[in-house]
Amino acid sequence: MSRSMPLRLQKYMNKNQASSVRPNTTTPPNQRHFSFQPLGFVIVRCIQDKRTAKYWYKSYQSIRRLYPSVPIVIIDDNSNPLYINHKLQSQLTHCQFVQSEYPACGEILGYYYFLKHRWFQKAVVIHDSVFIRAHVDFQACSPVRFIWQIETKGFDDIELETELLQKIGGSYLSLYEDKDKWRGCFGVMAVIDHDFLVKMGDMFKVIGEIKSRRHRSCMERIFAVMCFHHYPDLLSHLSVMGDIHEYPLGWGYT
């Protein structure tokens, strides 16, 4: 791994099915509110065992080291309660925890709760397995920029993605079919302004249907198409880190 890489991706998606047990994660009283800020981070986590229990905290630490006072919101997506360290969570600063009511919905949850709560003006939405290694000027990423882009269309799930886009409505489907005009968003991770996300509110018409790895993968294209629809110039400055398939050996299935 090159030391010049400002972000590291430890893993993409755990192969195991998410547990049906819902944790009781709550934000300690001294962490429930922070003042509105121009920038914040949203980490979507899913703890399944001792190993994955370390990911979100390492991600939190990597942010804190470079952005000491920036607010962080951690969205818990159906973690196994046996591996949640409530004492550790109570010691974190400028940090809130949100328990999702949509189990196994995955990355889209970061946007759903950011749209709903507007904790800050701009959010960096990442997985719990992304670790920031160097300072990035995320404030310059407006109104939206992917963390990694997907250049290939070889992973497109045309049948299911078409079905979901039809349920969302609008004119997104015609853009989806014009493959040269958009790129995928790896892991549905992006830097996004709240005002811009408001334009994409129809995306959450299908949030209750995102319950499998296949559905979550489809959102890499659906989210991207909606971003391009509302901001066609995205193609000129697409992502922070470039094409994920050219990224040096920092990711894989675990």
Residue spans for each PLM region:
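ER/Golgi luminal nucleotide-sugar-dependent glycosyltransferases, focusing on the catalytic module
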Residues: 6-254
